[in-house]
């Protein structure tokens, strides 16, 4: 996909891989919505990136919050051409540790953000992309999911993280096949 003049949402965009991705897209002439819960860092990055960037305070696991980020991209830049899913958390906790069994709430939180949040963003972004006109190459959009080697080779204390990233890996191909057809 041609990056110049295309509109992208980068989740987890205020730090780490997400911030690096947002900077790279902006450097190539893309317009970027930095979607993240960290308002201070997100606003600072959007300001750094200039007029072609916006910040959306976004909880990827919330339908309303995710939809607001998609709506911002469409209203600010006229459409949506790409989504890069970088949002995620890694909370290390053993299945059975010194303090007892792994907290179910911790496991659920990691799955909710890393897996369900990724799915949530994909479904909403895909719908927005489907409303746009194809570019000169016939493309309507692109979605990039980030996973981890932990999906295939998780380590001690990574049950929740490995399961969440394994889920991202597992859903990416069937969704890609569906959206490509």
Residue ranges with predicted function:
Residues 90-108, 127, 131-137, 157-160:
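Conserved mid-core segment of classical short-chain dehydrogenase/reductases
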Residues 39-40, 56-68, 104:
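The beta1-alpha1 cofactor-binding region of Rossmann-like NAD(H)/NADP(H)-dependent oxidoreductases
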Residues 28-45:
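Conserved glycine-rich Rossmann-like NAD(P)H-binding loop of the short-chain dehydrogenase/reductase
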Residues 127, 177-178:
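Alpha-helical segment proximal to the catalytic Tyr-Lys
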Residues 89, 100-120, 144, 161, ...:
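Catalytic Tyr-X3-Lys loop
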Residues 148:
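Residue(s) in the substrate-gating loop at a strand-loop-helix junction
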Residues 2-33:
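Canonical Rossmann dinucleotide-binding motif of NAD(H)/NADP(H)-dependent dehydrogenases/reductases
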Residues 122, 164, 172:
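Active-site helix of classical SDR
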């Amino acid at each position: 996909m041609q990056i110049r003049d295309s509109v992208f949402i980068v989740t987890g965009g205020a730090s780490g891989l997400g911030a690096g991705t947002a900077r790279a897209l902006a450097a190539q002439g893309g317009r970027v919505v930095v979607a993240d819960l960290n308002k201070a860092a997100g606003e600072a990055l959007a300001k750094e990136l200039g007029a072609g960037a916006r910040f959306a305070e976004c909880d990827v696991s919330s339908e309303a919050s995710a939809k607001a980020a998609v709506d911002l991209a469409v209203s600010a830049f006229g459409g949506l051409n790409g989504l890069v899913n970088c949002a995620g958390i890694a909370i290390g906790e053993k299945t059975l540790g010194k303090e007892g069994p792994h907290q179910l709430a911790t496991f659920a939180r990691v799955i909710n953000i890393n897996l369900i949040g990724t799915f949530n963003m994909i479904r909403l972004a895909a719908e927005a992309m489907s409303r746009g006109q194809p570019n000169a190459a016939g493309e309507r959009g692109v979605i990039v999911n980030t996973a981890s080697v932990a999906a295939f080779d998780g380590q001690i204390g990574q049950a929740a993280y490995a399961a969440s990233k394994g889920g991202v890996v597992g859903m990416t191909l069937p969704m890609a096949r569906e959206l490509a057809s």
